[in-house]
Amino acid sequence: MSTNDDLKTKFVRSVDDRNSLSNVGARWTKRELGRFESDDHRGTTLVVIGGVHGNEPAGLIAAMRVLDTLNAEEPTGFHGQLVVLGGNLPALNSDDENARYIDFDLNRIFTDEQIAMPEDTSVEHGQMQELLAALRSIRAQSERMIVMDLHTTSSDAPPVAVFEDSIMAREFARQMPLPIYLGFEEELDGLVIDRVTNELGSVAIVVEGGQHNDPQSIVVHEAVIWAGLHASGILPIGSLIGSFAHETMPGDVLRKAVGDQAYKVFDIRHRYAIEHDDFVICPGIVAGKKIKQEVTPIAVENGQEIVSPVRGRVFLPNMQETKRVGDDGFFIVRHIDEGWLGFSARLRKQEWIHRIIAHLPGVYRIDDAGHGSLYVDRDIAGVLKRQVFHLFGYRLIRHDQHDGGHGVVRAWNGMTSFCKAFFRGPIPGGPDENDPRFWIVRRHHLDRIDRIDRADR
């Protein structure tokens, strides 16, 4: 068993003080801040990442508390590894307590193009390379890796789980009583969890644990880590009943924090990117508020009211002290019936359905080494809508807000769009990859891995 004891000693020990963000005196100087492992540590590894944004240290504080408990109790039921990694160390160590990042948002640059750039391109490019190297090394040494990226929010909102919607990720996340938000990766490029999922083939989820400076966010994140250890099969939670950390069961902590939102599922429908640093969320706009399409003012930017092109609920309204052009202004989400997920899981496993989809008029396979990507005529895509692609397990890589209508109008538009594509005939050689008339969709990577694994059994 091992951990970085020198870092642990920098945390105050009294229960009251441990709940306070302001009492943490540690300087985050190491990429790997600690680990706890059993003798058979080549099994499952749970990686906890905290501080990807400098003003969000709660996840790291919670992770160090978990390591403290594990080292104090040395539970015999522990099989595997828990590894804690720091995210944006310079931003975490900044004298500006509101510093989210130094040059670039670290959680937006894990793309192929940015990874290919020199480490000295920016502070965050160097941090990205170090963090990615650590994750690759851990994955190479583990039979199975699961990553939990812990964050907090600028607005007052209940804890939530966010991940790419694969069946494997669902099975892991739904063992925790958190509301689930799907489709983030379709609106944001360069997420840490997106790189982990699609390069390293591992389940990866983001957990937003509460508001930045709320001490309860530490308690929530600690409960999330214990629940993650249990869900991954590394440590049955019953092994720690009676310890000071488990006077309240982790699941009960999370249920209390989320209230009636437990296990509810939402789909992200729109992201507004800030275009001017004079951006303010309107009074009364809070996470979860219902808004009307093109009606409800959500923010004021450079003197102009901002409304949403879609209806739904507000998610993650930006209340940061400092805002930069390109930052997330807000998201709009809609609730999904839980029965939809079960139906979706059954459909995704039917390979004949995917073969039919690929041969529909206006749909073209993309030669991408078996990743299951398709070009889809935007008129047809607008009729099918993103929720239908999600149902069959496709992620939107390139899309727009084109809407094929509702009810009878949608049925008519669908019929005419398919007829046009049918009589037009296939495009020789397929569409140009930059043709905006076509959406690009791709099957979820972990669903394809799961299919291959099942076929090999």
Where are these regions (language model features)?
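Structured catalytic-domain cores with a bias toward divalent-metal coordination
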Residues: 1-457
